[in-house]
């Protein structure tokens, strides 16, 4: 019997599917799902609690209410399985069929499906080529629509009002056919010939010229083709049969007191059934048309509400005024099916409790309370008790555990040994938020956590809680141990730096231990080794800080991995020698023997240990460091008292000086010498400087102390002040915080980011007065409000990033591409922000790296650059390397190993199946909460170092100018006349050391290739105005300068000099609106002077607000300034910072006023102007000129006649990433986004590897727009996956046909997530209704490639350990598809062989 059952069950196995397809259901299909028609709106009999027959809970249709028992009770027990009771008609089977059996309702009149009607763009409307308004009027019985015009002059699908219809009836009788309601729409859809429509549209597409029409046609064509290809029938968008959800999925639960709690769906279904039955009765009675019509309309509305309540008209509400939850609401949103039940499930075998410190634990351990362990490991304990024969049955074992007998604890110890548990702290922002530990049983009720993993969990012990999960199966335990054990996660996946780094107490202890003190007890001793040093310390013959000589043995590994040692006397301190005892062999003593061992140095120590000696040593070392640190922190006795905050004596004089300066500025302002804005800025500058000076004085005062040395002389040494030591070691606090404690609090910001000009001169030691306290609260409250917003925004960013990147998995070893991105060191101004070595570390070289100036290959192609290679590049002064990148990987799905490079968390080449997309998303999203929300205003002490007005080089070398145009002025200095010029300083090896932007009009004292010495000032400019510089010499001639109309004269009161100011267009009278004030240059005869190398006259148009300080017909030389444009407006543009900036970059949002870039290479000219815009024309040397209209208020960087390259900046502003992609290509846009995102994170001191950002960029670039379709089935203008085009092109090329040409698109992460191939993934992200509607119409097939889809359908994900499972299935499937070779048994084979041989012999 059992085997029979097994056989029956096997038929329904749904494991073996490779894809999920979604489509429209035909009425027949709905009937085939159904187990019977629901005819009555009744649910259950409230007296007997039995379901009503033919009602919404009918047992005959949906199955029995009790297991193996029919409704009337005639058949009970298993033996009657499968019998259908003749009395009540119920099949005797399990109740759970009530979760899967569906019913149906035969609708008396067809009804349109609201999703295909109202979800924009309306599918029904697009298909019928009618406006949505018109279709609605037909469906809701307001108008007639012509279905068959016959011989009349009406047209098909023409709308007729009631009167028009009656007139037509009178005129033509029944020659034509017109109807209303869903029947009419159904008839129209049924009459469509899709093939004919397609041919018609393709013809129209050939002929049409208008862009809008072409777009509309393409949309409609794609829809019609989708219907044809998917085998969906357009009529199926109109429902004539409505499926009914199985009753256990819309339960009715009796509450005590005779009331019922019910799912909203039951109410909605009841309304549909009531109206449907009433309509049937009305039709039978042949009621008047108007009544029937009203009933049909009501039926349509009730079905609309059932499918998607609130989409049309007001939402139907229940008894408590709350809108009812329809079928659509069930699946969408955070509480919907996708996100609540399919992507996030609850787990059994878990517990949670408060965490506390376990400083004596080893790194791989955690303390688990006995109570919790007993509960969590129950099944294992029961099993063990039974296996030992201590309990006869599970029930007996249960009893023993409940009584907590002595033997149970012994068994628990055994069970727990070597059985890892997983600890998780919410919010889990990156993969280190869940790690595995070996449990150690402890008393008490709190989980004990190892202090070093706190950084990864972002945990502290102020009441945080953590959850424990038990991996049950052997595979799960193995994975937890091999992959998730805390000892295997020493490096952060975001940056590749150690994340198991001591902080706070431990750092302070080690720092204190390794400091030196002058003339301490025991100074000058000679010690035989670390052990003797420790002895000396313990016997109080020497203190920790005493400077002594110790005999130290250092070990080092050579290339072959052999240990060699050398011993020598080293000047050091007692503390450092003691610390050396725990340092593993193979590290140099210099790492310990430093001025002070702060947090950075300890991090370096651990990193070096990991790279040189491997994981095991590092783990042991980290634990030892922690124990030592804690011990010596306790011995140090560092604590904070109010006297430790030393206030510098100079503070009060500095403040008095600043106050005097402010008073002076105030006087100047009152006498009208400075404007309000200037006064404000100057006051803030004064206070910012004063604050800096007080802070400096305070730190100088705190950081050194004077002591008497052995010779009795005074000497300076680093201070042992507690506050200073905490900050200096990196344990807690920073210079900025000490400044508030003992310096002055300084300037405070208002919530809008502007700075209050009254500073807080007091510090926390002195205490604030009421006014100062009030000013402080202003910004502080903003900070708290920001934090709450930030957390939500950051979480949403992470969610979008994960969604867009989830299907990037390492799928292949090498895609073989030669493409890549060129890496150079990041230089801003005079300092190197990031060395080349740091940027290319862990990358794979795309082309051979040559030694500069030779043909010698330093690093061959496909080398993984590790630390040693990077040092080699550094030694040979290589200044650019082309490395492979995720962005340029040519794999169709996922990415290859070489393009990704090193697995940052493990330190070797990445493995296949690694889910690099999700790791990238987590790495970018996790620090999100640390980023600021604020938009920075320039003009605050925060960001205003005095405006730059010159360049002073910081290193010696030679100077280079890049894409610079310049003229030489009368003083034979160079004046820059180009916009995007860059000046770099190069050392003798040709490496770029510094890089500066040169603004237009800067005056250089050195030329290209000249040598410069450190400290030289090589360029100056005026930061507050933008000059207009003449490129020719001649006499000035003013054009359109009319006093009071286009210009006004102003005389400076102080200097008596007069200047001419051009009026803004808004200030001019109507007469001056069309005039363009221009400065022309003429020679002595009055003829125009030409710009050298062109036939353009030299004339300079002046924008509004420009100031001219020349008189008409003055003589000017080359490079002289004709006019200045004040740069006030430009300076106060808000710079969006922090989190919003990162979100903007990844969403690829166009900035408000983007930079205007040249679309083609050519010469600039201006054409006819309109009211608010001017016409920019770029004429190439050959081909069509390009025109663009630009707002007049945009300041242009080009003058008439200038030559521009494609992608040059014409008007300044933030660059739009789409423009960069279009004009400069994929590499440029990738570099732009990477640098901009890194800029934000670098400001916050967060380190993220470029790889992660590139992974996201790859996903943003995965769509292309078809330009020419070639011989493919794509349409021009269609947006397609990059991979699909590549696959199609390879096939076309192989067949020798025309390939597709396309342009790459940049999509924001939200758009990109919704545009994935997988509709399941897109639907579970956002806009569920729209995604599913679109997918259903085009009959989409989801190949289940990404991680999310597989989680939703309940499979292993195709990454990590699940990767091999999916590959195995794939291979199995391919094997099934291949023709099977005929099987031959051994005897047959030997006979065949003999026959062949005989044949061969008999031939002779």
Swiss-Prot record:
Keywords (alphabetical) are: DNA-directed RNA polymerase, Magnesium, Metal-binding, Nucleotidyltransferase, Transcription, Transferase, Zinc
Enzyme Commission number(s) from the entry: 2.7.7.6
- Give the superkingdom in one word: Bacteria
Query: Which residues does the record give as Zn(2+) 1 binding sites?
Result: 70, 72, 85, 88
Catalytic activity annotation:
RNA(n) + a ribonucleoside 5'-triphosphate = RNA(n+1) + diphosphate
- Is the Protein biosynthesis keyword given for this protein? no
- What cofactors does this protein use? Mg(2+); Zn(2+)
Give any Pfam family that matches. RNA_pol_Rpb1_3
Q: Does the keyword Zinc apply?
A: yes
Sections of the chain in a coiled coil: none
Q: How does it assemble?
A: The RNAP catalytic core consists of 2 alpha, 1 beta, 1 beta' and 1 omega subunit. When a sigma factor is associated with the core the holoenzyme is formed, which can initiate transcription.
Name the protein family: Belongs to the RNA polymerase beta' chain family.
The record's NCBIfam families line, in alphabetical order, gives: rpoC_TIGR (TIGR02386)
Q: What role does it play?
A: DNA-dependent RNA polymerase catalyzes the transcription of DNA into RNA using the four ribonucleoside triphosphates as substrates.
Q: Which protein are we looking at? A: DNA-directed RNA polymerase subunit beta'
Task: Please report the organism this UniProt entry assigns to the protein.
Answer: Photobacterium profundum (strain SS9)
Q: Could you tell me the gene encoding this protein? A: rpoC
């Amino acid at each position: 019997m059992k085997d029979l059952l097994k056989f029956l069950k096997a038929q329904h196995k749904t494991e073996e599917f490779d894809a999920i397809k979604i489509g429209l259901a035909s009425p027949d299909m709905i009937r085939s799902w159904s187990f019977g028609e629901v005819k009555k709106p009744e649910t259950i009999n409230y007296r007997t609690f039995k379901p009503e027959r033919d009602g919404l809970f009918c047992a005959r249709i949906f199955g029995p209410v009790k297991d193996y028992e029919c409704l009337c009770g005639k058949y009970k027990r298993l033996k009657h399985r499968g019998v259908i009771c003749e009395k009540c008609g119920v099949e005797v089977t399990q109740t759970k069929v009530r979760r899967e059996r569906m019913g149906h309702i035969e609708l008396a009149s067809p009804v349109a499906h609201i999703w295909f009607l109202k979800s924009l763009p309306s599918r029904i409307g697009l298909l019928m080529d009618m406006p949505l308004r018109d279709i609605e009027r037909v469906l809701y019985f307001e108008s007639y629509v012509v279905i068959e015009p016959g011989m009349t002059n009406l047209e098909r699908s023409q709308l007729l009002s009631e009167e028009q219809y009656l007139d037509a009836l009178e005129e033509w009788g029944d020659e034509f056919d017109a109807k209303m309601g869903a029947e009419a729409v159904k008839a129209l859809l049924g009459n469509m010939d899709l093939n004919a429509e397609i041919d018609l549209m393709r013809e129209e597409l050939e002929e049409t010229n208008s862009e809008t029409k072409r777009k509309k046609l393409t949309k409609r064509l794609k829809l019609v083709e989708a219907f044809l290809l998917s085998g969906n029938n357009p009529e199926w968008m109109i429902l004539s049969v409505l499926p009914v959800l199985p009753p256990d999925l819309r339960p009715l639960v009796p509450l005590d007191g005779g009331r019922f709690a019910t799912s909203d769906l039951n109410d909605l279904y009841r309304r549909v059934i009531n109206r449907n039955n009433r309509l049937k009765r009305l039709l039978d009675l042949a009621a008047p048309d108007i009544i029937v019509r009203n009933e049909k309309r009501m039926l349509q509305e009730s079905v609309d509400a059932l499918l998607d309540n609130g989409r049309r008209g007001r939402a139907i509400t229940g008894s408590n005024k709350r809108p009812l939850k329809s079928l659509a609401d069930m699946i969408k949103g955070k509480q919907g099916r996708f996100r609540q039940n399919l992507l996030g499930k609850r787990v059994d075998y878990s517990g949670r409790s408060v965490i506390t410190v376990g400083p004596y634990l080893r790194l791989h351990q955690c303390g688990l309370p006995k109570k919790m362990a007993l509960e969590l490991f129950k099944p294992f304990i029961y099993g063990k008790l039974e296996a030992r024969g201590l309990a006869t049955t599970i029930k007996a074992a249960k009893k023993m555990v409940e009584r907590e007998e002595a033997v149970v604890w012994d068994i628990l110890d055994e069970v727990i040994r070597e059985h890892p548990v997983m600890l998780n702290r919410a919010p889990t922002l990156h993969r280190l938020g869940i790690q595995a530990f070996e449990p150690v049983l402890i008393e008490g009720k709190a989980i004990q956590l190892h202090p070093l993993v706190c950084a990864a969990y972002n945990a502290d012990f102020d009441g945080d809680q953590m959850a424990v999960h038990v991996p049950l199966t052997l595979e799960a335990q193995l994975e937890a141990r091999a992959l998730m054990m805390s000892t295997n996660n020493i490096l952060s996946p975001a940056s590749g730096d150690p994340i198991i780094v001591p902080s706070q107490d431990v750092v302070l202890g080690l720092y204190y231990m390794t400091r030196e003190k002058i003339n301490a007890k025991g100074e000058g001793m000679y010690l035989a080794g670390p052990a003797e040093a420790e002895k000396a310390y313990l016997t109080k013959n020497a203190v920790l800080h005493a400077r002594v000589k110790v005999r130290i043995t250092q070990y080092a590994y050579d290339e072959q991995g052999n240990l060699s040692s050398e011993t020598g006397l080293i000047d050091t301190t007692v503390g450092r020698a003691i610390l050396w005892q725990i340092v593993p062999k193979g590290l140099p003593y210099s790492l310990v023997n430093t001025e002070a061992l702060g947090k950075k140095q300890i991090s370096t120590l651990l990193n070096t240990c990991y790279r040189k000696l491997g994981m095991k040593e590092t783990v042991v070392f980290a634990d030892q460091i922690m124990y030592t640190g804690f011990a010596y922190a306790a011995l140090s006795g560092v604590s904070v008292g109010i006297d430790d905050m030393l206030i510098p004596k100079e503070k009060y004089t500095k403040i008095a000086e600043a106050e005097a300066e402010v008073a002076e500025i105030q006087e100047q302002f009152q006498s009208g010498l400075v404007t309000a804005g200037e006064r404000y800025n100057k006051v803030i500058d004064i206070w910012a400087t004063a604050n800096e000076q007080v802070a400096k004085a305070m730190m100088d005062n705190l950081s050194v102390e004077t002591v008497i040395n052995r010779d009795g002389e005074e000497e300076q040494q680093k201070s042992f002040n507690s506050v200073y030591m905490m900050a200096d070691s990196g344990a807690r606090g920073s210079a900025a915080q000490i400044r508030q404690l003992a310096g002055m609090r300084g300037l405070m910001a208002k919530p809008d980011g502007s700075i209050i000009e009254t500073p807080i001169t007091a510090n926390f030691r002195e205490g604030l007065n009421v006014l100062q306290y009030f000013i402080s609260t202003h910004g502080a409250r903003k900070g708290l409000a920001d934090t709450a917003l930030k957390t939500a925004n950051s979480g949403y960013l992470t969610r979008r990033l994960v969604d867009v990147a989830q299907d990037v998995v390492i799928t292949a070893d090498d895609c073989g591409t030669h493409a890549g991105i060129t890496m150079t060191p990041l230089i801003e101004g005079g300092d190197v922000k990031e060395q080349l070595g740091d940027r290319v570390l862990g990358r794979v070289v795309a082309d051979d790296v040559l030694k500069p100036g030779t043909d010698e290959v330093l690093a061959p192609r496909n080398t993984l650059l590790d630390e040693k290679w990077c040092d080699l590049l550094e030694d040979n002064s290589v200044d650019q390397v082309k490395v492979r990148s995720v962005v340029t990987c040519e794999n169709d799905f996922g990415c290859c190993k070489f393009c990704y490079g090193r697995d940052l968390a493990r330190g070797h080449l990445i493995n296949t199946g690694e889910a690099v997309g999700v790791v990238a998303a987590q790495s970018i999203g996790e620090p999100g909460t640390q980023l600021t929300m604020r938009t920075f205003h320039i003009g605050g002490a925060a960001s205003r170092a005095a405006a730059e007005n010159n360049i002073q080089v910081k290193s010696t070398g030679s100077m280079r100018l890049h894409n610079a145009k310049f003229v030489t002025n009368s003083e034979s200095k160079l004046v820059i006349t180009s916009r995007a010029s860059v000046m770099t300083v190069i050392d003798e090896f040709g490496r770029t050391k510094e890089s500066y932007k040169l603004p237009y009009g800067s005056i250089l004292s050195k030329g290209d290739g000249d040598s410069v010495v450190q400290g030289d000032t090589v360029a100056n400019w005026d930061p507050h105005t933008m000059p207009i510089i003449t490129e020719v010499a001649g006499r000035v001639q003013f054009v359109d300068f009319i006093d009071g109309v286009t210009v006004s004269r102003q005389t400076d009161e102080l200097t008596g000099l007069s200047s001419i100011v051009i009026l803004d267009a808004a200030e001019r009278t109507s007469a001056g609106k069309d005039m363009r004030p221009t400065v022309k240059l003429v020679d002595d005869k009055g003829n125009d002077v030409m710009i050298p190398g062109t036939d353009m006259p030299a004339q300079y148009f002046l924008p509004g607000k420009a100031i001219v300080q020349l008189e008409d017909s003055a003589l000017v030389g080359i490079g002289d300034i004709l006019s200045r444009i004040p740069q006030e407006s430009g300076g106060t543009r808000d710079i969006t910072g922090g989190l919003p900036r990162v979100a903007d970059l990844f969403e690829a949002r166009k900035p408000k006023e983007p930079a205007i870039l040249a679309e083609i290479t050519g010469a600039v000219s201006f054409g006819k102007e309109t009211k608010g815009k001017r016409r920019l024309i770029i004429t190439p040397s050959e081909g069509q000129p390009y025109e663009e209209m630009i707002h007049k208020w945009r300041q242009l960087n080009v003058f008439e006649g200038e030559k521009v390259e494609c992608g040059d900046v014409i008007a300044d502003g933030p660059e739009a990433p789409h423009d960069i992609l279009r004009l400069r290509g994929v590499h440029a846009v990738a570099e732009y986004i990477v640098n901009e995102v890194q800029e934000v994170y670098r400001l916050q001191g967060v380190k993220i590897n470029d790889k992660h950002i590139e992974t996201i960029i790859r996903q943003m670039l995965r769509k292309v727009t078809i330009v020419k379709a070639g011989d493919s089935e794509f349409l021009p203008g269609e947006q397609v996956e990059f991979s699909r085009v590549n696959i199609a092109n390879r096939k076309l090329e192989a067949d020798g046909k025309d390939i597709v040409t396309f342009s790459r698109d940049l999509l924001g992460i939200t758009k990109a997530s919704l545009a994935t191939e997988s509709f399941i993934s897109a639907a579970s992200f956002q806009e569920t209704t729209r995604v599913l509607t679109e997918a259903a119409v085009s009959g989409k097939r989801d190949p289940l490639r990404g991680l999310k889809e597989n989680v939703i359908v309940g499979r292993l994900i195709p990454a990590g350990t699940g990767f091999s499972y999916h590959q195995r299935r794939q291979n199995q499937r391919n094997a099934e598809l291949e023709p099977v070779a005929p099987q031959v048994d051994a005897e047959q084979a030997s006979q065949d062989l003999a026959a062949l041989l005989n044949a061969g012999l008999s031939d002779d």
